[in-house]
Design a protein with these regions (language model features):
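Glycine-rich phosphate/pyrophosphate-binding loop and the adjoining helix
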Residues: 64-125
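Helix-loop-strand module that forms the ligand-binding subsite of alpha/beta enzymes
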Residues: 1-66
C-alpha cells in the first residue's frame, strides 16, 4: 500500500482504503481463515515532510489487524524533511536510499510470501 505523508499522517485516500478493507475482517475462506491470511503486505511512503515512520506504522498496523503478514523492513520511503520541497521526479537526493530499501522490501515480501505458500497459516482452533 502506498501513501503520501499529509500533516504527518497517511492521506485521506489511504485511510479510506483501510476503512473499506476493514470489511475483510468478517470474510473467511472455505477453511475458515480470514481472507487476508497467507498474504503479505508492505508500505511505500512519499512526501516532503517528516512523519514517514509514523505513516508506515499506522498503515502496517492496520494491515496486520486485517490479517496480512508484514515482514520486517517491508517499507520504503522518500522525503526531504519538514516543509515544502521538490517532487521526487525533480530531485535526485535520497533516491538511492529509497531504491535500496525498496529492493529490500521486495525481497522480504517475496521471501515471506514463498514461506507462507509452502506452509500456510491455519484457521484458529
Amino acid at each position: 500500500m502506498a501513501s503520501p505523508t499529509w500533516l504527518g499522517r497517511p492521506s485521506s485516500v489511504a485511510q479510506r482504503v483501510l476503512e473499506r478493507m476493514d470489511a475483510l475482517l468478517s470474510e473467511t475462506d472455505d477453511q475458515g481463515r480470514p481472507v487476508a491470511y497467507n498474504r503479505v503486505a508492505g508500505v511505500v511512503v512519499t512526501g516532503n515532510e517528516d512523519g514517514a515512520h509514523h505513516v508506515i506504522s499506522e498503515i502496517s498496523g492496520a494491515l496486520a489487524d486485517i490479517g496480512f503478514t508484514i515482514p520486517g523492513q517491508a517499507w520504503t520511503y522518500w522525503h526531504l524533511g519538514p516543509g515544502p520541497g521538490p517532487d521526487y521526479l525533480d530531485e535526485r537526493k535520497g533516491r538511492d536510499w529509497a531504491h535500496s530499501t525498496g529492493r529490500t522490501m521486495a525481497d522480504n515480501l517475496l521471501g515471506v510470501a514463498r514461506a507462507l505458500s509452502e506452509r500456510p497459516l491455519q484457521a484458529a482452533g
